[in-house]
């Protein structure tokens, strides 16, 4: 019989070994995981068992079906294995991915760098000695590991040639992998959690074609491999830190290295391996390895796993192993690309918290101070008491199911919101649109919570559009994202709404419609009424400090269709709730914010939030529309530490409400009556409704028409300006109107400067200025001078309002004919006739009048009054040369002296001295620097009117003793004067 023919291939064995090594580097068909140090090495059982008797004995101890012993030894005892539960599992099939979970073998005390070189030698039959063989410590370390594993070719490396004794299988720690050590989302039965078992192709595994020849790590890009090789060469010099000396036969040398000679890991479970310290009354537990302090002992024990070799949290996508689960979670995010940090303003998601913080600072104007933290005694950080959590941490999806890209399609069943697993705001775009499930509307929330289905941290009440199902898919339309605003009272809702949406396809994320903001309102009867009418609230009516939306907020995968609405209609973006924040103490949730709530004296939002008050707010909308069009459509950035609201003038309030105190509001019946009073003259509307520029409000005094009610009220304030009683101690709110061109000036000085222009234009020149004191109780003003009420210039508060108990005030109160009104400077008419029943208002005074002044001697000492008295004509010449623009106010208080010398300087018949203490402290600076001097008689050369003043100076009444008060704060009780700010 001829011998059988044979076909031999000498290159078959190297080719198979080469393919096995490539599969190992790619992670294909690997059924065992070796952990050395902090690195995970995937490998094949058959290759390890064929190359090392150590691995053969260790793998036989945990094999599913025990094999008969090869050398006649007894089978390992079941007590020595920790994988008894896997003995009943069926053998692995021939598929690329076996149904049984891979084994995990931990090699305590084995350095990762040396084991990587040994594993590369097992799969490639080649070994690159560190440093070209010159690094004796590294070569000796590899030789010691080769003798420990029983690899004959590596036993001769280094000094000594001790024979290898296979250790007992119990010395190797084998563990059944739990959920943390499985593959990406693998269960014990071989399927995915929450999904059917899906066979994965080799393309789904990460491809790493560039392995490191020293440690076996593989890289995607060759540049990263070059960088790693440079670090790997430098790290090879420090491999002798495992307790191996440079030479010798002692316990520290490589000759006597065995399992007992290698350094044992530090155990934190056998005894207290920490130091207790007391710092400032706080007990701190300090780690003995890294000296990191912790407040509780449980935190230290949890931290101790970092320093031990028990690294039981391997990465599901690479070879790294972590001591704590959160370390692995943060690391796996870079593999999966999950965006877990979600912005509560625009629902944008980010991979890291730092990217989120940068986004909020750049796009939403969030102050970094709100997100700051404070140091704790143990060296960590804790949030401040008033720190706001402006992000939401989404659950990690890859931990429960394999990571899918959005191109793989949507799940079969529609996703419905759950109380424990929130649905992300941005859904994957699929060819088949999802049908959102509409849950039952729950009760409105007005609390701050951190666990709810909406993609927001702070919960607010349901809005009209959100309750109708206009929200994004997964939110249920019941809740919305959050906006931070200030603590202010609510404001009534407006009647103006969004225009009806056109039946066009949804707008792009960059269109203005997708970036509109709908203010949230409480779900109640008023909201239900608006929904029945098919209306949406108008954005921008409530001036809230909202965050700018970045991109399309409503750009979800499914079509946001609501109940009772067609799918083709353009839905408004999901509403943003409003959160008021009181910095420093607490966060308060409000339903409505208004720009006029910060202005006292106007309507209360709580009183007029009902639906019946909505009809009464329509007349102010045209004016506000014009203001909004001028200001632009940009949202104001949120700055919690700054106020965007300027204080409103006291005279800007409504004339009907000015009589009430500032802090109180009129009753509701009065508000309705006043509003209806403004609407007594209805405008004629055209077929298309009244236009924006139509004037339908007319003044009852001058019949001038105005387009808005607000302008009419401001105009009527000019008619009755300064006639109402202002609060004691507050600055007067009088506005000064020019009698020639009806220009309204805020201050008397501005009115005087404006009046000089008319004085130049008039041919008659400047009229003779006259001082007159109005008398409120005796007589009324003639009808021919009815329009001169705004021309009055209120100089200061009357002496009766001071309440200081001065003698002049007491004399004024005792006299019935005393004038309790403010002195008025005016001119243009004849002085009052003697014996008349009332005062006739004189013409307007064109120049500032300084009644009394005091000079100061610089050498007489500080604060001492100088010589008071009239100034001669020389001062008047100086005034005419300098002009009225250089007249200044006297900066400091000084005493006023009244006597015959003072009264003789005035060409008027003063029958009452009650108003004399009120004066403008206007002085003329001295050219020589000797102080300020009064200039009244020299400036105004008044002609003596025979009807008003006698030829001789009148006999003044007995002078009132006025003691000079001491100079101090709050002690000017007997003397009144008007400061500079009181004129305006």
Swiss-Prot record:
Post-translational modifications: Phosphorylated by HIPK2. This phosphorylation reduces stability and triggers ZBTB4 protein degradation in response to DNA damage.
Sequence ranges assigned to domain BTB in this UniProt record: 30-131
Pfam families: BTB, zf-C2H2
Region described as Disordered: 71-104, 172-210, 227-262, 461-575, 593-696, 713-734, 756-836, 853-876, 947-984
Chain ranges of zinc fingers (C2H2-type): 210-232, 285-307, 313-335, 341-364, 697-719, 736-758
Gene3D superfamilies in alphabetical order: Classic Zinc Finger (3.30.160.60), Potassium Channel Kv1.1, Chain A (3.30.710.10)
Covalent link location (Glycyl lysine isopeptide (Lys-Gly) (interchain with G-Cter in SUMO2)): 40, 548, 590
Biased composition (Basic and acidic residues): 628-637
Phosphothreonine: residues bearing it: 766, 768, 955
Listed Pro residues bias regions: 948-966
Composition bias, Low complexity: 74-88, 478-488, 507-529, 807-819
InterPro entries linked to this entry: BTB/POZ_dom, SKP1/BTB/POZ_sf, Znf_C2H2_sf, Znf_C2H2_type, ZnFinger_BTB_dom_contain
Bias (Acidic residues) ranges: 604-627
Interaction with CBFA2T3 as annotated region, ranges: 165-324
Main location: nucleus
CDD domains assigned to the protein according to its UniProt record, in alphabetical order: BTB_POZ_ZBTB4
Gene Ontology BP term (one): DNA damage response
Record-listed Phosphoserine modification sites: 367
Keywords: Chromosome, Coiled coil, DNA-binding, Isopeptide bond, Metal-binding, Nucleus, Phosphoprotein, Repeat, Repressor, Transcription, Transcription regulation, Ubl conjugation, Zinc, Zinc-finger
Organism superkingdom: Eukaryota
GO cellular component: chromosome; nucleus
UniProt-annotated location(s): Nucleus; Chromosome
Role played: Transcriptional repressor with bimodal DNA-binding specificity. Represses transcription in a methyl-CpG-dependent manner. Binds with a higher affinity to methylated CpG dinucleotides in the consensus sequence 5'-CGCG-3' but can also bind to the non-methylated consensus sequence 5'-CTGCNA-3' also known as the consensus kaiso binding site (KBS). Can also bind specifically to a single methyl-CpG pair and can bind hemimethylated DNA but with a lower affinity compared to methylated DNA. Plays a role in postnatal myogenesis, may be involved in the regulation of satellite cells self-renewal.
Subunit structure, as described in the record: Interacts with HIPK2. Interacts with CBFA2T3. Interacts with ZBTB38.
The protein, known as: Zinc finger and BTB domain-containing protein 4
Annotated source species: Rattus norvegicus
Lineage, highest ranks first: Eukaryota, Metazoa, Chordata, Craniata, Vertebrata
């Amino acid at each position: 019989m001829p011998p059988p023919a044979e076909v031999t291939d000498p290159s078959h064995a190297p080719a198979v070994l080469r393919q096995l090594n490539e599969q190992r580097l790619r992670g294909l068909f690997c059924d065992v995981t070796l952990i050395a140090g902090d690195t995970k090495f995937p490998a094949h059982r058959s290759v390890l068992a064929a190359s090392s008797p150590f691995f053969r004995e260790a793998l036989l101890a945990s094999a599913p079906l025990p094999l008969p012993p090869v050398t006649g030894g007894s089978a390992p005892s079941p007590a020595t294995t920790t994988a008894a539960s896997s003995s009943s599992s069926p053998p692995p099939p021939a598929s690329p991915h076996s149904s049984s979970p891979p084994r995990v073998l931990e090699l305590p005390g084995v350095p990762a760098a040396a084991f990587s070189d040994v594993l590369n030698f097992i799969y490639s039959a080649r070994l690159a000695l560190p440093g070209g063989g010159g690094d004796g410590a590294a070569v000796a370390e590899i030789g010691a590991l080769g003798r420990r594993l029983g690899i004959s070719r590596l036993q001769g490396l280094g000094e000594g040639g001790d024979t290898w004794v296979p250790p007992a299988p119990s010395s190797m720690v084998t563990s059944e992998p739990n959920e943390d050590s499985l593959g990406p989302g693998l269960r014990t039965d071989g399927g995915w959690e929450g999904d059917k078992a899906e066979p994965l192709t080799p393309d789904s595994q990460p491809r790493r074609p560039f392995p490191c020849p020293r440690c076996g790590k593989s890289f995607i890009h060759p540049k990263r491999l070059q960088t790693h090789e440079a670090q790997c060469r430098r790290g090879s010099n420090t491999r002798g830190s495992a307790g191996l000396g440079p030479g010798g036969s002692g316990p520290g040398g490589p000759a006597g290295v065995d399992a007992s000679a290698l350094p044992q890991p530090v155990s934190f479970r056998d005894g207290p391996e920490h130091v207790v310290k007391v710092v400032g009354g706080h007990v701190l537990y300090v780690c003995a390895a890294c000296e990191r302090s912790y407040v509780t002992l449980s935190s230290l024990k949890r931290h101790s796993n970092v320093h031990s070799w028990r690294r039981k949290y391997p990465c599901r996508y690479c070879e790294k192993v972590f001591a704590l689960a959160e370390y692995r979670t943060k690391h796996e995010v870079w593999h999966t690309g999950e965006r877990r940090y979600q912005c509560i303003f625009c629902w944008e998601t980010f991979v890291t918290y730092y990217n989120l913080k940068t986004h909020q600072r750049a796009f939403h104007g969030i102050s970094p101070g709100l997100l700051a933290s404070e140091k704790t005694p143990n060296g960590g950080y804790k949030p401040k008491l008033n720190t706001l959590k402006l992000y939401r941490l989404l659950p990690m999806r890859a931990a429960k199911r394999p990571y899918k890209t959005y191109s793989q399609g949507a799940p079969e069943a529609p996703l419905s919101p759950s109380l424990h697993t929130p649905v992300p705001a941005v859904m994957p775009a699929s060819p088949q649109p999802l049908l959102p499930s509409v849950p039952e509307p729950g009760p409105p929330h007005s609390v701050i919570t951190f666990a709810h289905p909406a993609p927001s941290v702070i919960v607010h009440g349901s809005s009209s559009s959100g309750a109708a199902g206009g929200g994004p898919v997964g939110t249920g339309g019941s809740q919305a994202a959050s906006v931070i605003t200030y603590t202010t009272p609510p404001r009534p809702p407006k009647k103006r709404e969004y225009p009806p949406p056109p039946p066009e396809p949804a707008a792009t994320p960059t269109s203005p419609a997708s970036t509109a903001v709908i203010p949230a309102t409480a779900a109640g009867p008023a909201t239900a009424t608006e929904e029945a009418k098919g209306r949406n609230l108008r954005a921008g009516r409530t001036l809230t400090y909202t965050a700018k939306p970045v991109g399309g907020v409503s750009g979800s995968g499914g079509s946001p269709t609501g109940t009772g609405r067609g799918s083709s209609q353009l839905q408004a973006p999901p509403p943003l709730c409003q959160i008021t924040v009181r910095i420093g103490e607490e966060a308060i949730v409000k339903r409505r914010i208004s720009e006029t709530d910060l202005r006292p004296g106007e309507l209360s939002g709580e009183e007029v939030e009902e639906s019946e008050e909505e009809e009464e707010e329509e007349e102010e909308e045209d004016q506000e529309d014009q203001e909004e069009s001028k200001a632009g459509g940009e949202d104001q950035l949120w700055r919690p530490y700054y106020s965007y609201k300027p204080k409103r003038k006291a005279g800007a309030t409504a004339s009907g409400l000015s009589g009430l105190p500032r802090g109180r509001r009129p009753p509701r019946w009065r508000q309705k009556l006043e509003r209806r009073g403004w609407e007594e003259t209805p405008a004629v509307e055209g077929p298309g409704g009244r236009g924006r520029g139509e004037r339908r409000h007319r003044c009852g005094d001058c019949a001038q028409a105005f387009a808005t009610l607000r302008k009419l009220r401001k105009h009527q304030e000019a008619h009755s300006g300064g006639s109402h009683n202002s609060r004691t101690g507050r600055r007067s709110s009088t506005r000064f109107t020019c009698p020639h061109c009806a220009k309204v000036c805020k201050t008397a000085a501005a009115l005087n400067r404006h009046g000089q222009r008319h004085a130049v234009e008039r041919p008659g020149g400047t009229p003779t200025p006259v001082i007159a004191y109005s008398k409120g109780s005796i007589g009324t003003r003639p009808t021919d001078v009815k329009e001169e009420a705004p021309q009055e210039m209120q100089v200061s508060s009357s002496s009766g309002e001071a309440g200081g108990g001065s003698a002049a005030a007491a004399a004024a109160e005792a006299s019935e004919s005393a004038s309790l009104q403010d002195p008025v400077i005016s001119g243009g008419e004849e002085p009052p006739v003697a014996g008349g029943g009332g005062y006739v208002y004189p013409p307007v005074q064109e120049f500032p009048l300084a009644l009394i002044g005091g000079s100061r001697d610089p050498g007489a000492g500080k604060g001492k009054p100088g010589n008071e008295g009239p100034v001669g004509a020389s001062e008047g010449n100086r005034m005419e040369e300098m002009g009225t623009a250089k007249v200044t106010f006297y900066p400091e208080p000084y005493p006023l002296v009244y006597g015959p010398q003072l009264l003789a300087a005035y060409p008027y018949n003063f029958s009452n001295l009650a108003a004399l203490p009120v004066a403008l402290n206007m002085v003329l600076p001295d050219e020589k620097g000797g102080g300020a001097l009064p200039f009244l008689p020299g400036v105004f050369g008044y002609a003596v009117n025979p009807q008003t003043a006698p030829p001789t100076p009148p006999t003044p009444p007995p002078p009132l003793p006025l003691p000079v008060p001491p100079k101090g704060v709050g002690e000017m009780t007997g003397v009144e004067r008007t400061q500079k700010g009181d004129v305006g």
